[in-house]
């Protein structure tokens, strides 16, 4: 395995790992990755469009666990909330999910599987991403494909 370290300045480091990073459970792959989030414990949560919606790794690539089977139709974005929960956006499923880091769905926003009329401005028609305000916890959701 070859590792290339790039110095991005101002204390930012970028490492490129060539080779086999992360052993995977049966049926999982690192293709069609929609987003990636690092939690406060340094674990890497990879949002995929495969059988397992979320693959969780240690920073060194050691596979820990997977979750999300049957939740998402087509995951599109993930955001770590200030409370340590993971927000997942499902564009084809037209829903937003707030989840614990071990995969329990805590809250759903929108009606999964039901799209608002295109260009109606009503939520949701293929949402794409979510941001959480660090001070207030307010959610900002882009409804980017069917309501853009």
Region roles according to the model:
Residues 1-148:
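Eukaryotic scaffold repeat domains enriched in small/polar residues
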């Amino acid at each position: 395995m070859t590792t290339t370290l790039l110095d991005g300045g101002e204390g930012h480091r970028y490492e490129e790992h060539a080779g086999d990073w992360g052993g995977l459970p049966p049926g999982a792959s690192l293709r069609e990755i929609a987003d990636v989030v690092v939690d406060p414990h340094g674990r890497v949560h990879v949002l995929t469009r495969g059988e397992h919606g979320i693959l969780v790794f240690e920073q060194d690539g050691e596979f820990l666990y997977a979750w999300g089977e049957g939740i998402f139709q087509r995951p599109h974005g993930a955001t770590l909330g200030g409370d340590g929960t993971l927000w997942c956006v499902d564009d084809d499923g037209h829903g937003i999910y707030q989840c614990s880091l071990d995969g329990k769905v805590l809250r759903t926003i929108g009606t999964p599987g039901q799209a608002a009329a295109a260009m109606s401005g009503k939520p949701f028609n293929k949402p794409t991403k979510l941001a959480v305000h660090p001070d207030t916890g307010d959610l900002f959701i882009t409804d980017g494909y069917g309501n853009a």
